[in-house]
Regions:
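N-terminal glycine-rich FAD/FM-binding segment characteristic of electron-transfer flavoproteins
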Residues: 1-264
Length: 264
């Protein structure tokens, strides 16, 4: 049994967001982090490793500097890493990205008891599309918004979060799960993990490594294969400070404020 975790390096939105003159994000000048939901996905895989002794492989698509993020995830406990990188993949939207990642997962190999983990969504796009699209392209059963996982033989009993409650789902492996922050508390890098992360294997899949997969076609990857166009990115203006009303006479206070503004 193996666990494959799809992760993404995203801009650190807690800092200053840089936008180019053409309205797109200036990612090169921004600090980056591992997408938060993806850390929950990794922790779910590592817990499965603790229980079963399975191998955990982390995979990301991005530029060469994304290797640093993968090394951090190896330091957290992952066993292997795969960086999918190439100019042909640049500019991919969620559709094209899922094509490429699905091909990478195919190359890694999905066995009958394997689980593919993804974060619910990335903070730079908030689409929650890539995980489900990977599952569709790999013809895997999928469960999204996963809040709890229990292994039961060759199946998993999964607690899925809904808008007004939870749903219990039993899913056969191999399968794909998208994970939410309520699922777990991601572990930190250990001292031993930091010292050994550079001894763990890391592969780079470029276009030539994946081109023989049926999912990889010139018209379905990169900017050319992306039906979505982003015309502008911007930081919304900060909202003004609010006024907190307390005490037993809040209704009278509110009436006074509205009267001063000539709203009543």
């Amino acid at each position: 049994m193996n666990a494959i975790v799809c992760v993404k390096q995203v801009p650190d939105t807690s800092g200053k967001v840089a936008v180019k003159a053409d309205g797109t994000l200036d990612r090169a000048s921004m600090a980056t982090i591992t997408n938060p939901d993806d850390l929950n996905a990794l922790e779910a895989a590592l817990k499965l490793k603790d229980e079963t002794g399975c191998e955990v492989v982390v995979v990301t698509m991005g530029p060469p500097p994304a290797e640093g993020m993968l090394r951090e995830l190896l330091a957290r406990g992952a066993d292997k890493a795969v960086l999918v990188s190439g100019r042909e993949f640049g500019g991919s939207d969620t559709f094209a990205t899922s094509q490429i990642l699905a091909a990478a997962v195919n190359k890694i190999g999905v066995g009958p008891e394997d689980v593919v983990f993804c974060g619910r969504q990335a903070i730079d796009g908030d689409t929650a599309q890539v995980g489900p699209q990977i599952a569709e392209k790999l013809h895997l059963p999928q469960v999204t918004y996963v809040a709890d996982i229990q292994k039961d033989g060759n199946s998993l009993t999964v607690k899925r979060m809904l808008e007004d409650g939870y749903m219990m789902v039993k899913v056969q492996t191999p399968c794909l799960l998208t994970c939410i922050k309520e699922l777990n508390q991601p572990r930190y890098m250990s001292v031993n993990g930091i010292f050994t992360c550079y001894d763990k294997p890391m592969e780079v899949f470029d276009y030539n490594a994946l081109k023989d997969d049926p999912l990889i076609e010139v018209d379905t990857i990169g900017l050319k294969g992306s039906p979505t166009n982003v015309f502008k990115s911007f930081t919304p203006p900060q909202k003004g400070a609010g006024t907190m009303l307390t005490g037993d006479d809040t209704a009278a206070q509110l009436a006074g404020i509205l009267a001063k503004k000539h709203l009543i």
